[in-house]
């Protein structure tokens, strides 16, 4: 059976691993998942990530905790296969008054809502992280 929404699966694996207080979570890799992991690392939500060089590459994400609590409090899928959410640069959502980030897929790559505003581009709002 094929997976309908691989990005939602990635976010769910991260959420479940943090609830179970795991240090590393692995999943099948893709270009989009690697780009989202890079944004999460740049924003300080995860410690690191690696892509294995096997026949079927695996993405391993090293989770980050602060004083025993997960750094990611909430991760939510916004645009989904059944209802895509495209926003212009003016319509990009702010998460918790700017404390969290929206991850946006633009024609210039996957980036945060702040970077998209600075670049003056809109795109598909993939998820929000706080």
Curated annotation (Swiss-Prot):
Gene3D superfamilies: 3.30.1370.30, 3.30.1490.10. SUPFAM superfamilies: Ribosomal protein S8. The keyword rRNA-binding applies. Keywords: Ribonucleoprotein, Ribosomal protein, RNA-binding, rRNA-binding. It comes from the Bacteria. GO terms for biological process: translation. One of the primary rRNA binding proteins, it binds directly to 16S rRNA central domain where it helps coordinate assembly of the platform of the 30S subunit. Belongs to the universal ribosomal protein uS8 family. This is Small ribosomal subunit protein uS8. It comes from Pseudomonas paraeruginosa (strain DSM 24068 / PA7).
């Amino acid at each position: 059976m094929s997976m309908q929404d691989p990005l939602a699966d990635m976010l769910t694996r991260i959420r479940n691993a943090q609830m179970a207080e795991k240090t590393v979570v692995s999943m099948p890799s893709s270009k989009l998942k690697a780009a989202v992991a890079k944004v999460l690392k740049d924003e300080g939500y995860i410690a690191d990530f690696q892509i294995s060089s096997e026949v079927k590459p695996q993405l391993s994400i090293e989770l980050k905790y602060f004083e025993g609590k997960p750094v990611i409090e909430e991760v939510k899928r916004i645009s989904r296969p059944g209802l895509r959410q495209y926003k212009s640069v003016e319509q990009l959502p702010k998460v918790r008054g700017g404390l969290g980030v929206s991850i946006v897929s633009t024609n210039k790559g996957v980036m945060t809502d702040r970077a998209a505003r600075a670049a003056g581009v809109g795109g598909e709002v993939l998820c929000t992280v706080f």
